[in-house]
């Protein structure tokens, strides 16, 4: 076949957790076009506006191409030797004066498994602390916690193929056509071809238009809805008793608890009509094979991890698990949210979520690396910021995360960053966070590195470089290894394949994983030593002691924030199709001309009350901050709620989000923020606290 | 069940099309309107094959196999129909298709030379309003692949077949261009287009971008 390209490389998309396989086409040394790989197991020859088109960022003129060090009030270019010299000097001094736990690192859910594993090894072995975390803390840590607690393992029980094999799918707090567009397209096609879809979301999402039933719950009332569905399933005899008896424990306590969650009671809490709750329970409960999928609309709440356990309850009581078409499929946000956590970039666990408190496991790493390690967990991201403000954390090494834009309570995050004695940022662009750095290291995008990403199906897929990092920028793995060696711990990796070999050697459930075996179509963990992977989990037993899954009897509790007279509306935040998270990449592409700015979605009823028309500027005020943006008047959002995204630094949505977080995992409660919205032109316009509205 | 394609015997499942059987047997059948991501359409008549016991050739992409069938991909009548069809398609284009396109590939495989018929050719009509996607309407051969990709792969329902006969073409929205349609910029249409009637500006830049010079605005 004749071609216009110098070279085409098959790799894995670096945007969301779907894990599309892509062909990256190179001309004159840079990637000029991307098309879908026909044999990609998750995308099957399809892509989206991000994966296919938003690659210009990689060639952007403002890529970081050389290390930068702080000098006076600004930065100047530096050699790698000087930049790394500054890091080792500062880290060694802080270690000597305050101990290794005064230093913390963040790995990135954007990086490869190999990058993340090396990053945690850097913090644990070279620095000597378990203070390592990654951005899955602020998105799917509740999913991970809950699935481990209910079922045993931290991952989807099946694959996206299950949507096509299912009769019914329940989507809770997830908007796939915007957040995970290729899976969104697959679900939409499945719905057109007969899949009965139930959507539960405060907003009427696009897939609701293709579904049987839409359940618009009040933000923060997911637990009541799920207990209500369980109530009807039990009351109307839809329980799979044989499955419950043979493979689970704790059903009776759950059955007893949900007795009080009658459809009428649940309507009172959630605002969903009782008849719709009955109908949804029957659709799900009577299906031959049913899937449940959820996203951050479930996890980013005060009781997010509990709601994921309630989702597991529903699947367990109907036996809708461990078969094709019967699966639990959390849609993971970033390309490697799954893998960064699988690969030990967490303060409390080793690879495969084995706790650092487990002496045998920690000893095995001590032996492998020739170092001494603590048996107590390190700090999570929110704890790191608190410790920095309070003064006990002195330095941070942040790789591939813009915490000053994406983490909640921006003012608190910035105060934390300013309180540090020393901050290293490793990124591909200047970010809101790197403004506070002492050393900035220029890294590589997913188009420029080798390694693996693990998608939302637990599938490890190869990332293969299609271009070189710009200027003197280096791959993340190279940089981490260099810093580690300078700190006196030579990891000895010659390639990213070596890193994965070490992971396989140290991790029984990943024993058969290697770059060679991953090949073109990937491997879904667990992978046995002989290379056999596991597309469907729990076909024989659950991975808990005794092999049984566990019901969790958990009541509904109100969210951390609630509307009141001063803040009468509830703000929900989320993604938009054209942009990706902090927008660092997509805002540097033509996607910006497709969606140049953000808006606040307001229901017409509220818009009239506030006195604002579509397109007019409004002020959104919460208990902790205030922002301004134009209003979009739409019936997609229910009265009483407003919605916006968090892609634009000029809006800085996260100034509004407070410190409330999931009880088990400290994942922030991004999805329920009480706000007041006022037209900037209204007569009683309140004066703005200017220091909070930084453009 | 078993079928034989050009003397190669293959075991196929009930419902397998003749095109799938031919590909399973490792035989080449040219196609224009077929894309494995979508349901078979049977519009282009280029995938014709001969079947023993059948007087006329059949469109292999839409015809299911039956047990014991003898299929010939090199059937003379089938090839003649396919070649003439491609020749007619080419005769309507103002220029030869770009070498990398599927249409050019099929024309090479069928050894279609300069078209024997010199009829009316499409006038260039370009639309460069979208930041990524470009229309070159004169290259549209009405295979329907873009419309079906938009419907059956993405589900955006942004594209529509328009016009009749020689004036058949494709349009986004109510002839409003991609940006003002329900298009979600997934690129499935550009990916499947066998002629570059829908393509990307970035790719046209590699060969000089006529769409950018001659847009309607």
Which residue ranges define each predicted feature?
Chain A
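N-terminal export/assembly segments and adjacent metallocofactor-ligating motifs
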Residues: 1-238, 246-250, 254, 265, ...
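Phosphate/diphosphate-binding loops
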Residues: 3-5, 11, 18-21, 419-422, ...
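N-terminal leader/propeptide and maturation segments of large enzyme subunits in energy/redox metabolism
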Residues: 73, 238-273, 351, 355-363, ...
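Glycine/threonine-rich phosphate-binding loop and adjacent beta-strand/alpha-helix elements that clamp
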Residues: 160, 447-469, 479-488
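Flexible glycine/proline-rich, aromatic-decorated loop/lid segments
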Residues: 203-206, 429-464
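A glycine-rich, hydrophobic/aromatic-adjacent loop/helix-cap motif
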Residues: 284-386, 528-531, 541-548
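Long, low-complexity segments enriched in small/aliphatic residues
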Residues: 331, 338-346, 364, 496-590
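Long, contiguous, secondary-structure-rich segments that constitute the structural scaffold
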Residues: 470-472, 476-529, 589-601, 605-695
């Amino acid at each position: 076949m004749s071609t216009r390209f110098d070279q085409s490389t098959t790799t894995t998309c670096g945007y969301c957790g779907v894990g599309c396989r892509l062909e990256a086409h190179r001309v004159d040394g840079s990637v000029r076009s991307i098309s879908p790989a026909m044999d990609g197991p998750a995308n099957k020859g399809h892509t989206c506006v991000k994966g296919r088109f938003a690659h210009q960022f990689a060639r952007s003129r403002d890529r970081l191409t050389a290390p930068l060090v702080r000098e006076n009030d600004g930065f100047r270019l530096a050699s790698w030797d000087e930049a790394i010299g500054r890091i080792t000097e500062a880290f060694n001094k802080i270690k000597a004066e305050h101990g290794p736990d005064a230093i913390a690192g963040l790995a990135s859910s954007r990086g490869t498994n190999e990058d993340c594993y090396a990053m945690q090894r850097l913090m644990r072995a070279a620095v000597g602390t378990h203070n390592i975390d990654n951005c899955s803390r602020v998105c799917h840590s509740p999913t991970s916690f809950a699935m481990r607690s209910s079922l045993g393992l931290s991952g989807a029980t099946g694959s996206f193929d299950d949507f096509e094999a299912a009769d019914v799918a329940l989507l809770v707090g997830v908007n796939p056509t915007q957040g995970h567009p290729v899976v969104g397209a697959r679900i939409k096609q499945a719905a057109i071809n007969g899949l009965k879809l139930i959507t539960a979301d405060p907003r009427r999402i696009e897939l609701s238009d293709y579904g049987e039933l839409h359940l618009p719950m009040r933000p923060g009332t997911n637990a009541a809805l799920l207990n209500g569905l369980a109530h009807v399933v039990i009351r109307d005899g839809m329980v799979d008793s044989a499955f419950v008896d043979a493979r689970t424990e704790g059903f009776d306590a759950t059955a007893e608890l949900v007795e009080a969650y009658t459809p009428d009671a649940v309507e009172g809490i959630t605002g969903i009509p009782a008849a719709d709750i009955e109908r949804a329970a029957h659709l799900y409960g009577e299906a031959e094979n049913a899937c449940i999928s959820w996203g951050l609309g479930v996890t980013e709440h005060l009781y997010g991890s509990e709601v994921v356990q309630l989702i597991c309850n529903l699947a367990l009581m109907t036996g809708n698990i461990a078969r094709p078409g019967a699966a639990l499929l959390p849609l993971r946000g970033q390309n490697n949210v799954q893998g960064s956590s699988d690969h030990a970039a967490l303060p409390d666990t080793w690879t495969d979520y084995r706790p650092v408190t487990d002496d045998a496991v920690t000893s095995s790493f001590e032996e492998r690396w020739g170092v001494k390690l603590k048996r107590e967990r390190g700090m999570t991201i929110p704890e790191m910021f608190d410790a920095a403000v309070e003064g006990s954390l002195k330095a941070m090494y942040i790789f591939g995360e813009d915490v000053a834009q994406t983490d909640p309570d921006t003012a608190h995050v910035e105060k934390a960053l300013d309180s540090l004695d020393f901050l290293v940022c490793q990124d591909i662009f200047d970010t809101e966070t790197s403004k506070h750095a002492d050393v900035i290291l220029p890294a590589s995008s997913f188009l420029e590195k080798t390694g693996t990403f693990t998608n939302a199906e637990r599938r490890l897929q190869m990332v293969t470089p299609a271009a070189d990092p710009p200027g003197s920028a280096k791959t993340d793995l190279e940089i981490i290894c260099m810093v580690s060696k300078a700190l006196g711990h030579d990891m000895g990796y010659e390639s990213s394949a070596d890193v994965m070999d070490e992971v396989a050697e140290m991790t029984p459930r990943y024993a058969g994983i290697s770059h060679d075996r991953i090949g073109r179509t990937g491997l879904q963990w667990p992978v046995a030593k002989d290379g056999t992977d596991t597309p469907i989990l729990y076909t024989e037993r659950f991975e808990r002691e005794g092999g049984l899954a566990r019901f969790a009897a958990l009541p509904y509790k109100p969210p951390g924030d609630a509307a009141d007279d001063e803040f009468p509306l509830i703000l929900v935040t989320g993604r938009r199709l054209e942009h990706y998270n902090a927008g660092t990449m997509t805002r540097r592409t033509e996607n910006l001309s497709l969606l140049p700015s953000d808006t606040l979605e307001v229901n017409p009823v509220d818009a009239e009350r506030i006195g604002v028309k579509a397109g007019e500027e409004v002020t959104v005020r919460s208990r902790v901050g205030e922002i301004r943006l134009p209003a979009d008047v739409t019936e997609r959002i229910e009265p009483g709620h407003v919605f916006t995204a968090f892609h634009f630094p000029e809006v800085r949505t996260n100034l509004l989000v407070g410190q409330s977080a999931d009880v088990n995992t400290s994942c922030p409660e991004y999805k329920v923020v009480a706000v007041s919205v006022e037209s900037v032109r209204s007569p009683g316009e309140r004066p703005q606290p200017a220091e909070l509205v930084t453009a | 069940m078993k079928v034989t394609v050009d003397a190669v015997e293959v075991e196929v499942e009930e419902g397998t099309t003749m095109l799938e059987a031919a590909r399973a047997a490792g035989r080449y059948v040219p196609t224009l309107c077929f894309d494995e991501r979508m349901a078979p359409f049977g519009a282009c008549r280029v995938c014709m094959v001969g079947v023993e016991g059948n007087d006329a050739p059949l469109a292999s992409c839409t015809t299911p196999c039956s047990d014991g069938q003898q299929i010939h991909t090199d059937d003379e009548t089938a090839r003649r129909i396919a070649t003439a069809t491609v020749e007619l398609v080419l005769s309507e284009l103002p220029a030869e298709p770009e070498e990398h396109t599927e249409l050019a590939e099929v024309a090479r495989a069928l050894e279609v030379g300069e078209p024997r018929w010199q009829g009316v050719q499409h006038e260039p009509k370009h639309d460069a309003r979208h930041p990524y996607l470009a229309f070159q309407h004169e290259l549209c051969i009405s295979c329907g692949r873009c419309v079906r990709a938009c419907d059956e792969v993405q589900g955006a329902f942004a594209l529509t077949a328009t016009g009749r006969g020689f004036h058949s073409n494709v349009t986004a929205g109510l002839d409003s261009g991609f940006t003002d349609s329900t298009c979600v910029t997934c690129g499935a249409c550009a990916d499947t287009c066998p002629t570059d009637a829908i393509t990307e500006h970035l790719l046209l830049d590699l060969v000089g971008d006529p769409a950018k010079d001659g847009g309607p605005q």
